[in-house]
């Protein structure tokens, strides 16, 4: 069994405000509805009910869980559904019939979804049971699902299926990951790419990573353009848009020392979009979704063309590192780049001057410096995401990425470590510097509680992402100033996070029963 989780599962496009409380339950309800349809039972269904246990029951209303369940029972997919179709789907339920799986109308009332916050099932703190009854009230089907963090779900009685044979490079710990990379002569990103290409073609991997990044970038743009208040009784005001305006005004006067402030604005933008139920990418969760995109955008906007890397090199496997990756001296390092030459429209990931396309040598093509810069950035983001995927897989396999299971250390701490490692990679860091950066970032989030005020993913979640984004950058810079050797290993920190999560009171694990949630007055 391998710890590795595909980037296309770890970074999933969905809706806010929570991966474990919105995306996961929607997927579970959708799976239940699909099973009714596929088994033919749907023709006999007269009613569908659901029970939300533990953390899902405690903070479900603030996290939009019942709304997500209704959307999932309709057959809607979090990756493609219009976010407006999910918002308040249960909260503003007018009564009448629910179209299950898009096929059968059954009577539905708001109290068909029951909240049981004091009941915790042994499988996971985030549990829900869905029941289909016939017209006489007899049970036709019943399934219990666990939303295990990051939008991942598991059906009761179903083992977590991780087929090691599908991945050529198998590792369960950071130590094993580094050993595999040493043995194969790979960067961490290249190791992840090898595993991804066991499932998809090289072009499909590149295009898929680009799609993930584009969704992240659109989320940042949407958050920076929005204003007003976020949903819920706290009436929290959006700030990303006003900060953007202030920063743009400052830049217009000639101030240029603003990258760190933009970093915070990027993170706020994502998490404000998430809190509003908008389109967001799990990274690795929704509650921590602003950290990695903010750090990646910080690199894209302020560092990608600066040449701030370590050395200029191409690995034996063709991946650019250091300044070559960052676009420094791109004319000499890369030669011409011809966009959109691949069959699927994706730009080539590796360009050799003697390659001919349609009889024309690339070194005879007209150099498009803007295309070179764009291609370099795209390569960098793919490297960033692949590195983060390998690191995030370790947290998911050996500890947790669920706030209901491990507190906020599991969500924000993991995301911060992934972002720190990704940034270190695109800044030309070695594998051991990457591991060091991830360790630094996680170490200083140990013990962090998940205590959302009012059960909403707003306070302290939104600001916390901005602070963690800054921490990720600091961790990367510290690691890059070292040689990769350090006293505390990433594996030791992952295990410490796991143990701390076990010891942590449930009051501090996404139940809103302790911490800020009981000391801040809801107005």
Protein language model features and the residues they cover:
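Alpha-helical support elements that line or immediately flank enzyme active sites
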Residues: 20-37, 293-305, 364, 374, ...
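Beta-strand segments within the central parallel beta-sheet cores of soluble alpha/beta enzyme folds
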Residues: 41-53, 307-318, 322, 368-390, ...
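Functionally critical mobile loop/hinge segments
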Residues: 52, 414-416, 421-523
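C-terminal regulatory domains involved in ligand/effector binding and gene-expression control
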Residues: 78-253, 262
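Conserved phosphate/anionic-ligand binding catalytic regions in large, soluble enzymes, centered on
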Residues: 11-29, 276-295, 346, 408-417
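Intrinsically disordered, low-complexity terminal tails and inter-domain linkers enriched
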Residues: 305-375
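Glycine-rich nucleotide/cofactor/substrate-binding loop typically near the N-terminus or early
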Residues: 54-94
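Accessory "access/gating" subregions that flank catalytic or transport cores
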Residues: 203-309, 371-403, 407, 498, ...
């Amino acid at each position: 069994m391998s710890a590795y989780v595909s980037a296309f599962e770890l970074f999933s496009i969905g809706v806010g405000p929570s991966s474990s409380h919105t995306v996961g339950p929607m997927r579970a309800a959708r799976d239940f509805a699909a099973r009714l349809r596929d088994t033919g039972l749907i023709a006999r269904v007269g009613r569908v009910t659901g029970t939300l246990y533990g953390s899902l029951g405690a903070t479900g209303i603030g996290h939009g869980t019942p709304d997500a369940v209704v959307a999932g029972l309709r057959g809607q997919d979090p990756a493609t559904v219009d976010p407006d179709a999910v918002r308040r789907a249960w909260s503003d339920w007018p009564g009448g019939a629910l179209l299950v799986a898009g096929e059968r109308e059954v009577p539905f009332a708001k109290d068909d979804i029951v909240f049981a916050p004091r009941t915790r099932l042994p499988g996971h703190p985030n549990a829900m049971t869905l029941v289909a009854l016939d017209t006489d009230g007899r049970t036709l089907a019943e399934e219990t699902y666990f939303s295990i963090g990051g939008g991942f779900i598991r059906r009761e009685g179903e083992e977590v299926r991780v087929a090691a044979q599908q991945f050529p490079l198998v590792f369960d710990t950071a130590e094993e990951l580094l050993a595999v990379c040493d043995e194969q002569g790979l960067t961490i990103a290249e190791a992840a790419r090898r595993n991804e290409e066991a499932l998809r073609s090289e072009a499909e991997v590149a295009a898929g990573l680009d799609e993930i990044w584009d969704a992240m970038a659109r989320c940042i743009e949407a958050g920076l353009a929005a204003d007003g208040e976020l949903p819920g009784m706290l009436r929290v005001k959006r700030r990303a848009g006003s900060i953007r305006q202030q920063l743009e005004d400052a830049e217009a006067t000639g101030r240029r020392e603003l990258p760190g402030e933009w970093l915070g604005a990027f993170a706020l933008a994502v998490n404000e979009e998430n809190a509003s139920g908008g389109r967001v990418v799990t990274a690795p969760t929704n509650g921590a979704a602003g950290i990695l995109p903010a750090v990646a955008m910080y690199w894209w906007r302020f560092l990608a063309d600066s040449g701030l890397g370590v050395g200029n090199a191409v690995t034996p496997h063709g991946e650019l590192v250091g300044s070559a990756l960052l676009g420094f001296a791109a004319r000499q390092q890369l030669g011409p780049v011809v966009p959109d030459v691949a069959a699927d429209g994706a730009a080539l990931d590796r360009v050799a001057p003697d390659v001919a396309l349609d009889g024309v040598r690339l070194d005879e093509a007209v150099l498009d410096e803007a295309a070179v810069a764009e291609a370099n950035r795209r390569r960098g983001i793919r490297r960033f995401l692949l590195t983060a995927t390998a690191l995030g897989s370790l947290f998911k396999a050996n500890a947790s990425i669920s706030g209901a299971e491990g507190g906020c250390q599991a969500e924000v701490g993991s995301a911060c470590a992934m972002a720190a490692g990704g940034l270190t990679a695109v800044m030309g860091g070695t594998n051991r510097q990457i591991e060091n950066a991830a360790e630094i970032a996680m170490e200083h989030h140990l013990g962090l509680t998940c205590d959302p005020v009012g059960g909403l993913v707003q306070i302290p979640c939104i600001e916390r992402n901005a602070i963690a984004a800054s921490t990720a950058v600091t961790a990367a810079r510290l690691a890059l100033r070292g040689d990769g050797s350090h006293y505390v290993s990433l594996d030791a920190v992952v295990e410490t996070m796991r143990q701390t999560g076990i010891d942590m009171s449930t009051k501090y694990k996404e139940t809103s029963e302790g911490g800020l949630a009981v000391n801040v007055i809801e107005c």
